[in-house]
Amino acid sequence: MRSIVTGGAGFIGSHFVDRLVSRGDDVLVLDNLSSGKAEFLAHHTSNVTLVNVDITDFDAMSPHFEGVDIVYHFAANPDIRLGTQITDTDLKQGTIATYNVVESMRIHNVPTIMFASSSVVYGDNAPMPTPENHGPSLPISLYGASKSAGESLVSSWVGTFGLQGYIFRFANIIGDRGTHGVIFDFIHKLKRNPSELEVLGDGRQEKSYMEVGD
């Protein structure tokens, strides 16, 4: 099986590369290393090729889809706050990048995509636990809007061009190689000052997490 993993040098993507290699896939990682790290893949001595390419550049990235069996699309802007400061960040790195992926798949006859979406597509008012068919999705961040748009692009390429697509709405992933997030910040604050613990709100908030290996 020849697989592409976009964003495969990132936190979640690199763990997915590990899993694909363990089952014998030949993996092509497309990553511009803006947030991903080549060292996350350095332990692979075979079956992994890292291509430093920006998937917002259609002409540069599209030829790599020739002869591929499946695409795992993880690449996106990992910094939600950045999107509020430079407001076209998620449009380019999320929506347009996802268009480039599915259109490259159409051109090169790649049959299957796994799209890494996010629970942020639901917005603030979703019931907990959230049923998969809850809707409409009302994202309240630009990142969430780009993920929602990405889901729609995948769905429309499935309906129009016969692509096979799977969408996963990840939430609060933690584990080795993580570079940011609530738990990451919490642990590093305690490491810097073990005698002081900052408590937000009343301290009774609850949040579910998933370990990246799961």
Q: What is each of the regions a protein language model found here?
A:
Residues M1-I173:
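N-terminal Rossmann-like NAD(P)+-binding domain of SDR-like oxidoreductases, especially those catalyzing
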Residues P127-M128, S155-D214:
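NAD(P)-dependent short-chain dehydrogenase/reductase
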